[in-house]
Design a protein with these regions (language model features):
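Histidine-centered catalytic micro-motifs
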Residues: 2-12, 130-138
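Divalent metal-binding segments
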Residues: 25-75
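Metal-coordinating catalytic core of metallo-dependent amide/deamination hydrolases
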Residues: 41, 68-148, 152
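Active-site-adjacent C-terminal substructures of enzyme catalytic domains
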Residues: 141-251, 261-268
Length: 294
């Protein structure tokens, strides 16, 4: 089953809001449209909307998702409530406070341009938890400061320069790319092939406000955008995300959790395929799902 390696599902209350706005106008803290809408919504509304998104992820074969969770400690608790009783496992990276990190599985930083984050990084390391940070989304200026924090992974990396690619390789820092989101926000698209040559690369769907949390759609877009094999894209959507978070899923091996997505190879869409992996990555969709075992 899939591992969605970067999400913001809190803005499930505002799907397709903000058409035509820039990245900063959409999501920059504290007053981007997303943050305004989150403040205006009740806790009940946000929990209900997040649960609908998690149910959609379950239907489309996602076993776990790495969530950068707004709202401090309360935001962490709200997401856990939204996921209660469902088969999908949220891996929550708290934001805004050290206390949110302590309540979650780690800390998700907005980006080095928004703050220094050394205190949060130190506290996260002391807790033995995961630290991720956005970098290189708008431009390259925040990549070196992000790498200086020794993060466990970076998100986006749309604008790496040769020096940054060398540092990624030297430090073996994984990267999560979200190409559909980057296209929607008009910041460019990540150099997926260059990144994949140098480090572990995973796929995420980013904000539900901007894109459905469908790994089928993300795989298809990435595969048709980048000069990488279908096998590599499938790993990006499964094993590599699990590896970043230390999850016991994303690959079928003896001793691992049996979290499986079963597709109907005789569906109208998949009947007659000549390359199964290529078809799963570039063609399959929710209509081809026969079963999800989580």
């Amino acid at each position: 089953a899939f591992v969605n390696a970067h999400t913001h599902i809190g803005d499930s209350i505002a799907k397709e809001a903000g058409g035509g706005l820039s990245l900063d106008e959409l999501v920059a803290p504290p007053d981007g449209l997303k943050h305004q809408l989150l403040r205006a919504a009740s806790r009940e509304e946000k929990v209900r909307a997040m649960r609908r998104s998690i149910q959609f992820m379950e239907t489309t074969g996602t076993a776990s998702f790495l969530e950068f969770r707004e709202g401090g400690v309360e935001g962490v608790y709200a997401l856990r409530e939204a996921a209660e009783g469902l088969g999908v496992e949220p891996f929550i990276l708290g934001r805004e406070t050290v206390e949110a990190m302590e309540a979650a599985e780690g800390f998700g930083a907005s980006g080095a341009r928004d703050g220094e984050f050394s205190r949060e990084r130190t506290a996260t390391a002391e807790e033995g938890k995961l630290f991720g940070i956005h970098a290189g989304e708008r431009d390259s200026s925040d990549i070196n400061p992000a790498l200086d924090l020794d993060p466990d992974f970076l998100v986006h990396m749309v604008h790496p320069e040769p020096l940054h690619l060398d540092r990624l390789a030297d430090k073996a820092v994984p990267v999560v790319v979200c190409p559909r989101s980057n296209l929607v926000t008009n910041v460019g698209v990540p150099p997926i092939a260059d990144l994949a040559e140098r480090t572990t690369l995973a796929l995420g769907t980013d904000n539900v406000m901007l894109n459905s949390p469908s790994m089928f759609r993300e795989m298809e877009f990435a595969a048709k955008l980048a000069d990488v094999s279908a096998h590599e894209v499938l790993r990006m959507a499964t094993y590599n995300g699990a590896r970043i978070a230390g999850l016991d899923c994303g690959v079928i091996e003896e001793g691992r959790a049996g979290k499986l997505l079963v597709l109907d190879g005789d569906s109208d869409n998949l009947a007659g395929v000549q390359d199964v992996v290529r078809a799963v990555v570039r063609r399959a969709g929710v209509g081809d799902v026969a079963d999800v075992i989580l």
